[in-house]
Amino acid sequence: MEQALNGSQRRKKIVMLLKQSPNPLSGAALGKETGVSRQVVVQDIALLRTEGYEISATPRGY
C-alpha cells in the first residue's frame, strides 16, 4: 500500500500536477491524485497562494 503524502509533499505534487496539465484540474481530481478530499485540496491551494504561487480558480478547476 502506498504511503500517504505529508502536507508539504502533497502541495508539491499539486503544483507539479497543475504545471503539467494543459487543462484545468478540479479539486476532486487533485484530491484523487493526492489521496485526500476536495476540501483538503482547497485548503492546500490557499496555503500555496500564501506562499506566493499564483493559482487561478475557474468553474472548470485550477
What are these regions (language model features)?
Residues 45-46:
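Short, hydrophobic-biased segments on the C-terminal half of alpha helices
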Residues 39:
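Key DNA-contact positions within bacterial/archaeal DNA-binding proteins
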